[in-house]
Amino acid sequence: MSPLSARSPRETVAFSAQRFPDHEALHIPLQACADFSPQPVSLTYRELDRAINEVTTLWQGTGIAGRVALVCENRAEFLIHWLALNALGLSVIPINHEMPDQEIPYYLEHGEAVAVCTLAKHLERFTDICSSNELDIPVVSCDSISSLNLGKPIEQPAPDPDAECALLYTSGSTGKPKGCILSNDYFLEQGHWYRAQGGHIELRDGRERLLTPLPLSHMNAMSVSTMAMFSTGGCLIQLDRFHPATWWQSVRESEATALHYLGVLPAILLALPESDGDDFSGQIRFGFGAGVNPAHHERFERRFGFPLVEAWAMTECGAGGAIIASHEPRHVGTCCFGRPGKPIEWQLVDENKKPVAKGMPGELRVRARGPNPKKGYFSGYLKNPEATEEAWLGGWLNTGDVVQELPDGNLIFVDRRKNIIRRSGENISALEVEAAVSDHQDIQMAVATAVPDELRGDEVALCVILKADTVDPKTTAESIQAHVLEKLAYFKAPAWVIFSSSLPVTASNKPKRADVKTLALKAIEEEGAIDLRHLKKRTKSV
């Protein structure tokens, strides 16, 4: 048997349990589990397989039929209950426990959850949420599944690659989050894709130990990390979250050979004091992620001794449209994410969906090559056929990401189309502005957004969290603008600067850009923003 013949994530684990029964499948370092375990959590493939079988039997006896919401953090319980339900042909709705109470009912109602399975410490909270919102949904803890009685025991069906495996919600810039229906095949293709890349991210069967701090409630950790390891007999090293102070300790003690990251991680790690133990070239083979600040990329690799391999993907495209710079040249420091592989058809288009001239930026559209252009992609948005049709307008997945092709065929990320600031006919990337101010001595975090301007159409507003309060906001704002002008053309500099003690972010610490824009507009309206428009002059270009 081979993972390549698996028909579901559960079957993938079963196959690896036969090939590598005594290899470690899951490891949670002590730094990530100290509040519930006196020692690191460790499960071999044999132990994980047995635990899944035991929990599958418990769920069978409940008579469950429908989606189950999982509130299990980045714990072994998440994987065990997800895969047990997967064995029964049932889907899960991962819920981030850090989500505010008022947001949770939407996910339970829209996703039509028939039960909530949670860690014991969240049981009372989620019971109260369901009760106060008049949701007739039973809530059980992971260790009391047998108390649930929803009908006659159910049969275990044969695995179906096309069956729904999970419902993951993606937050859009407007409106409610959309539920992405992800099939078993979606997850299987993630493992196949990772195994096929080679180059810097080549996976060695039974030998890799992949560390990730990302939440299992998101696509990267739930589908990419898990399937990469489970399909190769590797070990998933799952942190509860990113802990800068103990990050390298976790890396060393867990004997990680690879790691996954978000763009903010390298910046934070580079800010830590240098030490004699910074060189990980003898241990870590690669980092896999997206969004590293171009100014940090080469510095990070030189200091820590391993490549940060940039990739592009989105929940909707899965592995079907994923692209990664796993082979040279990687064009370090340019936001390059590689050359599309042969299984992918792609094009760059303008706002009218017409192909742009070679070398010009345009929206990336992707689809699978062959008879099924949606192979490896999401199955659609739950209860939203209009949005699904819009996503696949013209027979392509319209990603909304603005990308540029280099002469050698590699692609570089410019920005999300909705993050492009259009000022007097110039297209300005919010990410480019943010990168330009990231090393300003006073800035902890900065997010750029477009605000309306009667003369220019859009102007650049920059919302900033300072490392310490300033006694002279105007001078500090001017210093920030001057810092940008040293690096970018004058029209890209912030016209408005808004200081705030906090900015809205997602669970993975990405800015909630729609909320940031609302904050900026309100600050300007209420005269709480610093107006620097008069200082934007055509005196210098870079």
Residue ranges and their predicted role:
Residues 421, 447-453, 461-465, 481-542:
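Conserved C-terminal "lid"/linker of ANL adenylate-forming enzymes
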Residues 188-209, 217-258, 272:
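Conserved AMP-binding/adenylation subdomain of ANL enzymes
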Residues 11-13, 61-62, 83, 87-148, ...:
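Structural core segment of the AMP-binding/adenylate-forming
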Residues 59-62, 154-162, 167-212, 232-234:
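Conserved adenylate-forming
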Residues 256-261, 270-331, 345, 354:
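Gly/Ser/Thr-rich phosphate-binding loop
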Residues 354-390:
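Conserved ATP/PPi-binding loop(s) of AMP-dependent carboxylate-activating enzymes
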Residues 2-5, 22-62, 69-75, 79-83, ...:
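Conserved AMP-binding/adenylate-forming core of the ANL superfamily
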Residues 99, 370, 379, 387-390, ...:
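AMP-binding/adenylate-forming catalytic core of the ANL superfamily
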